[in-house]
Amino acid sequence: MTGVKLSVCIPYKARLDNLTIALEALARQTMGAEDFEVIVGAMEYSVELIGACAPFCDRLNLVTVCSSREFHIPRARNLAMRSATGEVVVQIDADTMLAPEALQRLYDRCFAFGQRGCAVGQVVGYDNNTGGDIDSVELRPYEEHLAALREMASGPGWPADPRFRVEHNIPWAFAWTGLIALPAAAVASDRLYFDENFRGWGNDDLEWGYRVCASGIPIVLRPDVYGLHLPHPRNAAANSLTATANADRFLRKWPRRDVELVCLAGDTRGNDLWPSYRAALARASGAAGFGVAVGTADGGTALLIGVPVDGAGHPVDGEHLSYFDAGARVEIVPLTGIVLPYEPGEVALGRVGPRIARLPAAYRDAVLAEAARVSRRVVVEDDVVAGGGAVAGGDGL
């Protein structure tokens, strides 16, 4: 380490106007410029980028690492992060404009005593790029954006980031990389780099956050550390396609009920639903929850969705084995079945166990829809208790 407290890492390609304001905000931090470095991981070589960075060279400890490889956000983040020399790695976006006090507060309140934690700051204004495509934007001067941020921070709707307005039940699901930090030593020891198999926009940061959480690092929300999301052009259809593909990749890599719920309901809504979802699983299963049994039937891949499992994820009995070929290896995957990590028609037989009918309607219907999507043939077992319908109790989506 070089004595630098923070390494601020920014992934970049072709977003010059946003980056210029982001750098201006960093140059105006109350933390001394000698205490932090800014590393731009740029997936391009361009005169324009160098020209935009040059005016900040006497105001910031600024490093630009360039690559001509194809742009992917995880790759650009890793490019910057592998050049970091500070005690703490801070990930922001090229469209994140930090409040002047952000870095000093972040270090003093989260890392000054060597804490091994992951701090998530507020990034407000994500709604300025929702609702469809954005072909062009007009960015205002830094001072105007700062005034808008100050007004929000002093208003009655604060905290304004939607993640900070629901219960934080699934820690990794709020690990958006608009403003997030963790010790560089943890990055190195636990290999907490971004998975470069994730392509395009969406879910690469959540999968990274999942691994941060799995490493035993607490993820903590810090409403007092915040920034503004700057508007930028946006292709909503393209983002939706890559987000869906990345969600599937995430679930295939980490097939777990929390991942499954966030893939179905989204990160904010999934956090809100998690306690009632777990309670609904316990009621319907008569155990800790459900698993999906995977094996072969008549030589083809088969699923049995809705196997009651205990708290360790083991089936409460061996009844599920009778649905598969004799002697077949049967694996229990810790999923309910509301989202399944299979391509359409990949499974020969999808069987839905009877207790799935006892789930709240939204979850039951999601299971049935997924079974139909991934299976060439579907069998739904009748439930004599629920009579084919959902039992009362529990929240829907």
Regions found by a protein language model. Name each.
Residues 67-84:
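Glycine-rich, basic loop-to-helix element that forms the pyrophosphate-binding segment
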Residues 26-66:
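Acidic donor-binding segment of Leloir-type glycosyltransferases
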Residues 15-29:
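Short, well-formed alpha-helical segments that are part of the catalytic scaffolds
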Residues 89:
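Short aromatic/hydrophobic "clamp" motif used to bind/position activated sugar donors
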Residues 102-147:
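Conserved donor NDP-sugar-binding/catalytic core segment of glycosyltransferases
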Residues 96-109, 360-365:
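Acidic donor-binding/catalytic loop of UDP-sugar-dependent glycosyltransferases
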Residues 139-172:
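Short, flexible, basic/aromatic active-site loop/helix in glycosyltransferases
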Residues 200-208:
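Acidic donor-binding loop at a coil-to-helix junction in glycosyltransferase catalytic cores
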